[in-house]
Amino acid sequence: PQYVASLIQEVRRGTSKPIICYPNTGESYNPATKTWFGSPLPFRAYVRTWYEAGARVIGGCCRATPADTHDIAEFRAELIREGVPPAL
């Protein structure tokens, strides 16, 4: 999650199409032991940054939890309250 905003900004330089953001939680997978390691990073701290960087469809991939989905939905509700027509 911590690298997504800069990646979105890079993609925006090359397209005017809507950008989809579907990150994982920042953990790493060890295929030898078939285990995940590292601490998951909560989406709550990043969703607004991703949106402000240019993402218009935001979801979650590997290891994203119902709490992460809730955080995305809460941010969408904030945008609606602010009068911004979200595309999330």
Region spans (language model):
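Domain-level signal for soluble alpha/beta catalytic cores
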Residues: 1-88
